[in-house]
C-alpha cells in the first residue's frame, strides 16, 4: 500500500517537488529499482481474459513467467536508453507488517472466490479483475528473477528487509541517482529522488525531489514521518477521521502524533459531553512509535559497504535458462541483446561494453555486514503455447 493518498496530497501541497520527464532524460544514470513491486506489475500486465478462461504466460511445467518477461523487457529498455538498473528485492518483512500482510492474504482469498464465481457466470472481465487481485510472488519466482538478472549482467541486491528502504539508503550514499518504485513510502525512508510511472512507454515519468518536497511542506523529517503514519502506512492502523489534509494541518499545529493524540482526546471528550459521536477513532493498537522507529532507522545494509558492478551478459546460459527452461523464443532474446549492442553512444554511454565490468555482486540479507538500522501489454517473448489457462 505504501502511504495512503500521499501522491495526491503532494500534488496539492508541494507541487514544485514534481517534474515530468521522458525516459531518455535518465541516460547515464544509475537507478535502484524495486524488483518486488515490478514483478507484481508485470504478472498482472501479462494476464488476459479468454472466452472462458484467464490466460497467463507460463513455462512448460505451468510455472508463471510473466514477471520474467517484464523484467527482461524493462532491463533491455533501461540499457537501451543508457540507464544502469540495480534491481533490489525485498528481504524478510518486518514484524510490524504482519497485520497488513494478513489483511492482504484475506483479500486475495476473497478475490479467488469472486474469480471462480465470475468464471461460472461467464463474466470474463470481472474474472480477470478479481484474478489479478490474487497475484502473489513465490520464492521460486523470485529465485528465477534473480537468476535471469544475474545472467543479464545487472547488479542484484537482496535487502535485509524492505527494498524501498535499501534503495533510499543507496541513494543517500550516492550509489544510485534515484529509487524507482510506485511505493510512496520510499520518501518516508528518505530517498533523495523518487521515480514513478515506468509502466508506460509514452507517458512521462514522475520525478519527486525530497528536498523540494520538504521545503514546500515546511515541516521536519520526523514530522513528515508522523504525517505518513497518520495518512496510513503498512505498519499500523490509522486514526479514523484523519485524512492527509487534516493530518498535515494537525502536524503543523501540534507538531507530533503525541500532541495530536492529546488534541483528539480533548475533542472526543467534548463531543461525548455533548452526547455526540466521537470525531476521531484511535485504533486499539496504534503502533505509531514502532512504525516511526522503523521508518527512521530501517534495517538496511549501509550504502558505503555495497559495491555496484556490472558484467557482460552471459548470453549462452541466459538463452539456456530462458529458452530451454522457461519457453522464451530464442529470436526475442537475440534481437533484444542486439538492440543494446548496436545502440549509438552519441551523447551518452549506452553500448553494452561501456556498462559492464568484471563481476556482479549479490548482497544477501544474512551478510555479516548487514546492519540494522507493460505500459502496453509486454510483448510476448515466449513461444506459442507458453500460456496457462485458469
Swiss-Prot record:
Localization of this protein: Nucleus, Nucleolus; Nucleus, Nucleoplasm; Mitochondrion
Q: Principal place where this protein is found?
A: nucleus
Annotated stretches, region: Interaction with PCNA: 348-356
Pfam families noted in UniProt? XPG_I, XPG_N
CDD domains given in the database record? H3TH_FEN1-Euk, PIN_FEN1
The record describes its post-translational modification as:
Phosphorylated. Phosphorylation upon DNA damage induces relocalization to the nuclear plasma.
Q: Which UniProt keywords apply?
A: DNA damage, DNA repair, DNA replication, Endonuclease, Exonuclease, Hydrolase, Magnesium, Metal-binding, Mitochondrion, Nuclease, Nucleus, Phosphoprotein
Protein residues bound to Mg(2+) 2: 183, 185, 234
Disordered: region residues: 359-390
* Superkingdom to which the source organism belongs: Eukaryota
Cofactor(s) recorded for this entry are: Mg(2+)
Q: Which Gene3D superfamilies match?
A: 5' to 3' exonuclease, C-terminal subdomain, 5'-nuclease
* A GO BP annotation: DNA replication, removal of RNA primer
Residues binding Mg(2+) 1: 34, 90, 162, 164
Q: Quote the EC number.
A: 3.1.-.-
- Taking the record's annotation, the residue ranges forming a coiled coil are none
Q: Does the keyword Electron transport apply?
A: no
PANTHER family from the UniProt entry:
FLAP ENDONUCLEASE 1, FLAP ENDONUCLEASE FAMILY MEMBER
Cite the HAMAP family for this sequence.
Fen
Q: Which family does it belong to?
A: Belongs to the XPG/RAD2 endonuclease family. FEN1 subfamily.
Q: What is this protein called?
A: Flap endonuclease 1-1
Amino acid at each position: 500500500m505504501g502511504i495512503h493518498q500521499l501522491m495526491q496530497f503532494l500534488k496539492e501541497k508541494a507541487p514544485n517537488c514534481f517534474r515530468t520527464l521522458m525516459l531518455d532524460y535518465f541516460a547515464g544514470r544509475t537507478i535502484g529499482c524495486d524488483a518486488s513491486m515490478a514483478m507484481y506489475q508485470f504478472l498482472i500486465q501479462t494476464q488476459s481474459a479468454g472466452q472462458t478462461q484467464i490466460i497467463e504466460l507460463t513455462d512448460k511445467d505451468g510455472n508463471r513467467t510473466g514477471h520474467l518477461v517484464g523484467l527482461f523487457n524493462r532491463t533491455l529498455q533501461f540499457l537501451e536508453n543508457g540507464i544502469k538498473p540495480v534491481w533490489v528485492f525485498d528481504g524478510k518483512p518486518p514484524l510490524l507488517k504482519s497485520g497488513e500482510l494478513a489483511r492482504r492474504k484475506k483479500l486475495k482469498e476473497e478475490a479467488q472466490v469472486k474469480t471462480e464465481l465470475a468464471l461460472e457466470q461467464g463474466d470474463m472481465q470481472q474474472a480477470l479483475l478479481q484474478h489479478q487481485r490474487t497475484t502473489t510472488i513465490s520464492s521460486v519466482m523470485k529465485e528465477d528473477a534473480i537468476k535471469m538478472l544475474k545472467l543479464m549482467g545487472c547488479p542484484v541486491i537482496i535487502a535485509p528487509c524492505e527494498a524501498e528502504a535499501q534503495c533510499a539508503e543507496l541513494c543517500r550514499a550516492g550509489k544510485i541517482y534515484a529509487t524507482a518504485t510506485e511505493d510512496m513510502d520510499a520518501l518516508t525512508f528518505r530517498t533523495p529522488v523518487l521515480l514513478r510511472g515506468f509502466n508506460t512507454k509514452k507517458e512521462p515519468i514522475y520525478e519527486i525531489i525530497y528536498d523540494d518536497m520538504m521545503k514546500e511542506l515546511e515541516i521536519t523529517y520526523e514530522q513528515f514521518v508522523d504525517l505518513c503514519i497518520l495518512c496510513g502506512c503498512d505498519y499500523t492502523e490509522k486514526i479514523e477521521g484523519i485524512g492527509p489534509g487534516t493530518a498535515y494541518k494537525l502536524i503543523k499545529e501540534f507538531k507530533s502524533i503525541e500532541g495530536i493524540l492529546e488534541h483528539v482526546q480533548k475533542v472526543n471528550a467534548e463531543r461525548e459531553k455533548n452526547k455526540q459521536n466521537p470525531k476521531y477513532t484511535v485504533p486499539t493498537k496504534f503502533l505509531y512509535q514502532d512504525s516511526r522507529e522503523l521508518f527512521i532507522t530501517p534495517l538496511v545494509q549501509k550504502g558505503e559497504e555495497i559495491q555496484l558492478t556490472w558484467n557482460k551478459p552471459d548470453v549462452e546460459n541466459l538463452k539456456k535458462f530462458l529458452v530451454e527452461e522457461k519457453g522464451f523464443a530464442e529470436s526475442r532474446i537475440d534481437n533484444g541483446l542486439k538492440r543494446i549492442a548496436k545502440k549509438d553512444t552519441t551523447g551518452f554511454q549506452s553500448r553494452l561494453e561501456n556498462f559492464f565490468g568484471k563481476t556482479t555482486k549479490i548482497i544477501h540479507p544474512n551478510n555479516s555486514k548487514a546492519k540494522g538500522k507493460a505500459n502496453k501489454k509486454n510483448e510476448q517473448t515466449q513461444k506459442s503455447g507458453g500460456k496457462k489457462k485458469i
